[in-house]
């Protein structure tokens, strides 16, 4: 649980620090040559298969212009198949044990996440938000012909390298309804 000092409209950017910390924790535990990517804003992929994602919660009564009483970053990662999904029929989905993480336990990933997240929060206090969001942007899956930035309110700004109009992708609606999460089964799908 976090106690933000910024209004909600800016405080929710901490989500990117959480996602970057999670991706880096999984990368640190991964076998060599394992690709770890984030699909904007909240889905985590290992070797281009969905393994999970992150979520951010805040009080329902929180106003965008006011400092919320709390924020909570949470994540769901599929470490092994639940039996509900046949991995042979769903190549777009995967589990950590299928990607060579057999010797890795959840405790190692949680510890790595905690270290990375605390470091990201410290970086944010010392060097500003741009420092904390760097690990996220480095893992963001995007076309090489685009530059990406995170706006003050957390929206993704996508700028073609060749110039042209910047595209804005709103964060708030995506946090309210994560596309990667099957709410009925409470697992990535």
What is each PLM-predicted segment?
Residues 36-48, 77:
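Catalytic palm active-site di-aspartate
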Residues 1:
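Active-site-flanking beta-strand signature of metal-NTP-handling nucleotidyl enzymes
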Residues 4-33, 50-189:
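Long, positively charged amphipathic alpha-helical accessory segments at protein N-termini or as interdomain linkers
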């Amino acid at each position: 649980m976090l106690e933000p000092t910024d209004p909600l409209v800016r405080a929710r950017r901490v989500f990117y620090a959480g996602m970057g910390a999670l991706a880096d924790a999984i990368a640190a535990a991964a076998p060599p040559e394992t690709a770890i990517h984030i699909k904007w804003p909240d889905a985590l992929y290992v070797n281009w298969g969905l393994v999970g994602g992150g979520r951010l919660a805040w009080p329902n009564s929180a106003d965008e212009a006011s400092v919320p009483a709390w924020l909570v970053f949470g994540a769901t990662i599929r470490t092994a198949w639940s039996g509900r999904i046949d991995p042979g029929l769903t190549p777009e989905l995967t589990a950590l044990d299928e990607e060579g993480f057999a010797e890795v336990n959840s405790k190692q990933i949680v510890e790595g996440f905690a270290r990375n997240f605390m470091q990201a929060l410290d970086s944010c206090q010392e060097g500003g938000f741009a420092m904390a969001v760097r690990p996220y942007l480095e893992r963001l899956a995007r076309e090489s012909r685009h530059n990406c930035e995170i706006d003050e309110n957390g929206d993704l700004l996508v700028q073609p390298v060749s110039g042209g109009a910047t595209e804005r992708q709103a964060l708030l609606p995506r946090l309210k309804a994560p596309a990667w999460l099957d709410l009925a089964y409470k697992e990535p799908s």
